UniProtKB/Swiss-Prot annotation:
The lineage of its organism: Bacteria, Bacillati, Actinomycetota, Actinomycetes, Mycobacteriales. This is RecBCD enzyme subunit RecC. Coiled coil: none annotated. In the RecBCD complex, RecB has a slow 3'-5' helicase, an exonuclease activity and loads RecA onto ssDNA, RecD has a fast 5'-3' helicase activity, while RecC stimulates the ATPase and processivity of the RecB helicase and contributes to recognition of the Chi site. GO terms for biological process: double-strand break repair via homologous recombination. The gene is recC.
């Protein structure tokens, strides 16, 4: 028999040659043809290609070379020397050898001589280190087996590997791989195997030395056909005399290469040629014609191993090679879909099946691709009889994503990953809530969107931060219950039975307010979820054998998650069973970090045959579809620092110290993948990369191999100014995207109608932003006015306008915090103080109010929080004592019904009133807005009951110190007139935003009242500086724009708004509102 070598520039030519070979049947009609392929994607494409050429592809078995090697060496069912099997006995050897002198280096790395936390941390590396060493030993056996025989040339700092390997060989009851390899070679030379008479090895660009030796030996009694994609027969012939491995540093073959891309990207092919034995036959299947395009010229130059620019002039419409510089990954996908739509529109014969998209980092781009393509059912093209402008045409393109990690595709395995992360962490509020929001957990506990909103609110209000309970916190040196899940859940459950107003608590548990009766069942489900999660995390701790870890993880998933289909559970059980089978009956104990490392590796992305060539647009990593011809090949994400992969040299890898030709180098492998992609494109090659930072706009260079491609294209033609690079703007609605010829020749770049509308808007004539309101709304009907509505309006007149329109202003989203409070800011201090003051006024003692606040978990922990609570308690006690001094009678309620004239009335109830006094108290520093909230009810009492001498007493904190500030307001002589004027302001404020911000207008009127400069005082309150001013309030920003000046509020007076001494609306409205109040101030003692 013989070794037959078939070479071609593209794999479709090789496939046609393989079809011709298979058309000549074997003597045995029942014999199966065996074809070895490098990846699942190649297998799918090749089977379809053979079916197309032969009419049917049957009795052909596709396998990868490793499965054939396993069959030849008798390890098809179980290979004890595979890295995943070898790791378990290796772990045992390492554990038993840590005290040996030769193992000191490894023992130090694993913390054998450490104590406490450092010991636990380093011991968590055990599996990861053992698996890495198992991979190194397997690499030695596959690429340089002689090293395992004599360990010749091993550096002194790696001498421990020899002793470790020898101990491992004694532990495993099987021939070591180098001995097994030698025996297999002898057997193959002596006699034929049970394999088919004819075998084919298709599409490989790199084979380890041992596999080449085995295949060569196999060719002794079998016909072995090696179908090798090689870009240049000229280069092959030039290097044909260079044979045999040698140190890579001594390889000078690149000097004999004529084309720069073959020199920089084709090292893997050159080194493979050195390893191959002399074939019995050598066939080259070349192409006679190339497209008259830039891509065709490049491919023909590569085939000729020469740069031949003579007579070539690049045509502007030639877009056969496109390189797109974008602002980040998201923008790359935007550009990609526009490019693909353009290609599909220009060529009606082009179909999605003819397009291949490859990217080095599939997990980064997968969600972006899912959002950018294939949403036709989610984003309909039409809305009723109208075109939906938000629907991008690319949403009609169906996309198939391959190579995804199992934790991304299987929801139960995603839950497993979350559980392992929680088990080794602090169980923060956000982590637990994220788990609760996952689909399987929602299904198990019946959580709806409203339920999750309520649970999030409970978590926030109960001040849950991290840790399940005191025991869970103990490893962190924190053993108090506050801010734990146990603390918060107890508050929620207690809130089911009693409210916060009951002034009662159970031990350290203060009932949570607002747990309504219709949420009782949800509170139970929430508590059940947290309790089951706590038990699962407890089980996922300590040290135990692998099967116990997997049993505990399975039990936790069963308790917490429920898939809506059967396949996720079946796949999870299959994956766990495979892990257990590889480990065998090992009793080696593992830690949580070991199990994480194990599952992270096992559940990583892997290609499956069903994800390729399904008629849709295929998206995958760079490996599965390498060398497979497509009319359009797109490479996405060729960013500097991402491609080629940054493979840091493993300091323990003896091969990396002095690599030989033919040994694996992932950066060289990635360069070869780029060369394969260039040759696989038959019509168009599209490449995108991040050429500018999406936040700062700072320019970023392309990946080095991509830069080499761009430089080579510049010398492929006589056009020295050739530039295939398109630099895209940051935004998809930039006008360059829609102007014909701005980015691509003669036509607009984008197909997005929304981008066109936005571009037109953004490129229109620039003008000053129009005022939010140019004219007031029609006046409201002169209905009666409720006192409560009047009070609410004057809390913030500008916001009152938006409230009247049911207009929602921007607000800060209240999320949960994972940080335990060690201090409280001013707003939090006010919240706590106001609550304690209210408790004291409702009858609680200051000490009891302090105890209740401590049980809420809002204060810092331990003595720090207790001291803070004492300070707040004392301040609240002073305020309450001052208020109770004026509340010397029981509070009464007074109904008011006041005729304002013109058929309108002001109605409502004023309470509580203590004798002739309205007494209000606030924890805030007493200011104008607090006085105003007492002034309006005082006017109502004075107007409704004019025969009494009413007084409003306002109490609050002072600007400095602790002594409460007390202000008094006496009843005016004309309360009805003043109320009518307030109602007039109220009517005007519902028609337009009035220039009446509360603090600013009070400062203006106070300065006017005291004879100071009103504009200076008001500007201090309005303009933001060290602290936010009223110009930053959302309502004011919406009404007058961001960073509005005080003069923007000083608008000309309108008829009926005049006020003595004021020349603009801010001054007039400020004086109308505040001067009567300021004139009514009087001492209360």
């Amino acid at each position: 028999m013989a070794l037959h070598l078939h070479r071609a520039e593209r794999t479709d030519l090789l496939a046609d040659g393989l079809a011709a070979l298979l058309s000549d049947p074997l003597p045995d009609p029942f014999a199966t043809e065996l074809v070895l392929v490098p990846a699942k994607g190649v297998e799918r494409w090749l089977s379809q290609r053979l079916s197309n050429r032969l009419g049917v592809c049957a009795a052909v078995e596709f396998r990868n070379p490793r499965s054939l090697i396993a069959e030849l060496t008798g390890t098809a069912d179980d290979d004890p020397w595979s890295p995943d099997a070898m790791v378990w006995p290796l772990l045992g050897v390492i554990d038993e050898s840590l005290d040996e002198p030769w193992c000191a280096t490894l023992a130090t790395h694993l913390g054998h001589f450490e104590m406490g936390e450092e010991y636990e941390l380093r011991q968590g590396r055990r599996y990861a280190v053992a698996r890495r060493l198992a991979g190194l030993f397997a690499s030695y056996a596959r690429q340089r087996p002689q090293l395992l025989v004599d360990w010749d040339g091993l550096p002194d700092d790696l001498a421990w590997q020899k002793a470790l390997w020898q101990a491992l060989c004694e532990r495993i009851d099987a021939d070591p791989p180098h001995i097994r390899h030698a025996k297999t070679l002898v057997q193959l030379h002596e006699s034929p195997t049970d394999l088919p008479q004819r075998l084919s090895l298709f599409g490989h660009t790199r084979l380890p030395a041992t596999e080449v030796e085995l295949l060569t030996a196999l060719a002794t009694h079998h016909d072995l056909h090696l179908w090798l994609p090689h870009p240049s027969d000229t280069l092959w012939q030039a290097l044909s005399t260079r044979k045999g491995p040698l140190p890579r540093r001594e390889d000078t073959s690149h000097r004999d290469v004529g084309h720069p891309l073959l020199a920089t990207l084709g090292r893997d092919l050159r080194e493979m040629q050195r390893l191959l034995p002399e074939p019995d036959t050598d066939e080259f299947r070349g192409r006679s014609e190339y497209p008259d395009t830039l891509l065709g010229w490049l491919q023909s130059d590569i085939a000729a191993d020469a740069v031949r620019p003579q007579g070539r002039h690049h045509r502007r419409e030639d877009r056969s090679i496109q390189v797109h510089s974008c602002h980040g990954p998201s923008r790359q996908i935007d550009v990609l879909r526009e490019v693909l739509l353009g290609l599909l529109a220009d060529d009606p014969t082009l179909e999605p099946r003819d397009i291949l998209v490859m990217c080095p980092d599939i997990e980064t781009y997968a969600p972006l691709i899912t959002a950018g393509f294939g949403l036709g059912d989610v984003v309909p093209r039409t809305r009723g009889a109208h075109i939906n402008l938000s629907a991008h045409p690319a949403h009609k393109l169906r996309v198939r994503l391959a190579d995804r990690a199992l934790v991304q595709t299987n929801p139960l395995l995603a839950v497993a990953a979350q559980l392992l992360a929680l088990a080794g962490g602090r169980a923060t509020a956000s982590e637990v809530l994220n788990l609760a929001e996952s689909a399987p957990v929602r299904a198990r506990f019946g959580f709806t969107d409203d339920d999750l909103d309520a649970i999030t609110a409970w978590t926030r209000e109960a001040n849950i931060r991290w840790g399940f309970d005191q025991e869970h916190r103990r490893p962190y040196g924190v053993e108090f219950l506050h801010n734990t899940w146990r603390f918060g859940i107890d508050r929620v459950l207690a809130g089911v039975a009693m409210s916060d107003d009951s002034h009662a608590w159970l031990g350290t548990t203060l009932p949570l307010d607002d747990v309504s009766s219709n949420r009782v069942e949800l509170a139970g489900r929430f508590a059940d979820f947290v309790e089951k999660l706590r038990r699962t995390v407890d089980q996922l701790s300590g040290t135990r054998p692998l099967h116990e870890w997997l049993d505990a993880l399975t039990a936790g998933i069963d308790a917490l998650a429920l898939a809506d289909e059967d396949w996720p559970a079946a796949q999870m059980q299959r994956e766990f069973a495979e892990i257990t089978a590889r480990a065998g009956d090992t009793a080696t104990s593992l830690r949580l970090a070991d199990v994480r490392a194990l599952l992270d590796r096992h559940l990583a992305g892997r290609p499956t045959r069903a994800n390729f060539r399904t008629g849709t647009l295929t998206v995958c990593t760079m490996v599965p579809m390498r060398s497979v011809p497509h009319r359009v090949v797109c490479l996405v994400g060729l960013d500097d620092g991402v491609f080629p992969r940054l493979g840091a040299v493993d300091g323990d890898d003896a091969l990396a110290r002095d690599p030989m030709t033919g040994e694996r180098d992932i950066r060289s492998e990635d360069r070869q993948l780029l060369l394969d992609a260039i040759l696989a494109a038959t019509q168009t090659l599209v490449i995108t990369y991040t050429g500018a930072n999406e936040y700062s706009g700072q320019a970023r260079p392309p990946a080095v191999p991509l830069a080499e491609l761009i430089d080579t294209l510049k010398i492929t033609t006589e056009d020295s100014a050739l530039d295939v690079l398109t630099r895209h703007p940051l935004q998809p609605f930039d006008k360059r995207n829609v102007i014909p010829g701005a980015l691509v020749p003669d036509e607009p770049f984008t197909f997005d109608q929304t981008a066109l509308v936005a571009a037109r808007a953004s490129s229109g004539e620039r003008a000053m932003r129009p005022a939010f309101f140019s004219d007031p709304l029609p006046p409201p009907l002169p209905d009666d006015v409720a006192l409560e509505d009047l009070l609410n309006f004057f809390k913030d007149p500008v916001k009152g306008f938006f409230r009247a329109l049911d207009y929602t202003l921007p607000w800060d989203v209240e999320g949960v915090s994972d940080v335990m409070p060690v201090d409280i800011d001013a707003l939090e201090e006010w919240t706590v103080g106001d609550r304690m003051l209210s408790d004291i006024l409702r009858g609680m003692t200051p000490a009891a109010a302090q105890q209740a606040e401590w049980r809420r978990g809002t204060l810092p922990p331990g003595q720090l929080g207790w001291r803070r609570a004492i300070a707040l308690r004392d301040q609240c006690a002073l305020l309450a004592a001052e208020a109770l001094g004026f509340r010397d009678t029981d509070g009464q309620a007074y109904d008011v019904d006041i005729d304002l004239g013109g058929g309108r009335r002001l109605t409502g109830t004023v309470s509580p009133v203590f004798g002739d006094r309205l007494v209000s108290v606030t924890y805030s520093k007493l200011g104008g807005k607090h006085l105003l909230q007492s002034w309006i009810p005082l006017l109502a009492l004075a107007a409704g009951y004019p025969d009494r001498d009413w007084l409003a007493v306002c109490i609050g904190r002072p600007a400095r110190g602790t002594t409460p500030r007390v202000e008094g307001l006496g009843g005016p002589d004309n309360p009805v007139d003043l109320l009518a004027d307030l109602v007039a302001i109220y009517d005007a404020g519902r028609r337009e935003p009035l220039p009446l911000p509360v603090k600013t207008s009070y400062a203006w009127a106070e300065a006017r009242h005291c004879g100071d400069d009103p504009e200076q005082k008001a500007g201090f309150r309005w303009r933001s500086g060290r602290y936010p001013g009223e110009d930053a309030e959302p309502a004011h920003v919406r009404a007058w724009g961001r960073d509005a000046w005080l003069r923007d509020l000083m608008q000309p007076l309108r008829p009926g708004e005049e006020f003595e001494g004021e020349t603009h609306r801010l001054g007039a409205y400020s004086s109308r509102l505040w001067l009567p109040l300021l004139r009514a101030e009087r001492p209360v003692r």
